[in-house]
Amino acid sequence: MNKGELVDAVAEKASVTKKQADAVLTAALETIIEAVSSGDKVTLVGFGSFESRERKAREGRNPKTNEKMEIPATRVPAFSAGKLFREKVAPPKA
């Protein structure tokens, strides 16, 4: 499912126009990106959490020259699925 298909589904479920659904979805995504970029954690109960995590510096190799090189530490975005989301995707076995 791409963004256009998601907008269509949200518009239908919420009984709003596609333009309104697109505006709300775009605003929500931009807000999540801004919050995570500034170091905040965004938690949507039942769905999951968005946050940025520190990736440590490590040693790597240049694939062309096979020469060792230092890969610097960096921040990366991360998503952790909530319990309800995980259970919907993979129901617990009885």
Swiss-Prot record:
One of its GO terms (molecular function) is structural constituent of chromatin. One of its GO terms (cellular component) is cytosol. GO terms for biological process: chromosome condensation; heterocyst development. It comes from the Bacteria. Keywords: DNA condensation, DNA-binding, Heterocyst. InterPro entries: Hist_DNA-bd, Histone-like_DNA-bd_CS, IHF-like_DNA-bd_dom_sf. Pfam families: Bac_DNA_binding. SUPFAM superfamilies: IHF-like DNA-binding proteins (SSF47729). The keyword Ribonucleoprotein does not apply. Homodimer. Histone-like DNA-binding protein which is capable of wrapping DNA to stabilize it, and thus to prevent its denaturation under extreme environmental conditions. It is essential for heterocyst differentiation. Belongs to the bacterial histone-like protein family. This is DNA-binding protein HU.
